[in-house]
C-alpha cells in the first residue's frame, strides 16, 4: 500500500504583519516624536526604541509566519551587515557613544527596513521577497556610511552631518 504523492503544495499562510507594523510605529513614535514634545524623555525614548526593536525581532522570529530560513536569515543578515558597516563608517560614528552609537541608531532603521520589506514583499514569491529584505537591510546600513557626527549637543542629541 502506497501513499499517493501530489504535486500540489500546501498553501502557506500569509505573513502576519500587523504586530511588526505596530511595533515599528510605536518604536519610531517613542524614539523620535515623544522627545520633540517632552525633551526630558530623550533617554527614555532611546531605551523604549531598543525595547521595541526587541519586540520586532521576537515578532519576526516567532509570530511572523515567515519560513524559518527567512526568519533566521534576516536576523543573521542584520547582525552581519551592521558589524560590517562599523568597519566602513566614519570614525566619529564607529567610536561615538563609547562605540555603541552605530548600534543604538541602527536598531530603529533596521527594524523599519525589515518590516517595510516584509510588508512590500508579502505577496511575492520567495526569491523577490528575500531580495527585498536583503536590499532593505543593506540600504539601512548604507545610510550610516554617509554620516559623521560632531559629538553630542547640549540637549544630548547627536550632532550628525553629511560626510
Regions of interest found by a model, annotated:
Residues 7-23:
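N-terminal membrane topogenic signal
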Residues 1-5:
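Short, intrinsically disordered terminal tails adjacent to the first/last structured region
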Residues 71-77, 136-140, 161:
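N-terminal low-complexity, Ser/Thr- and acidic-residue-enriched intrinsically disordered segments
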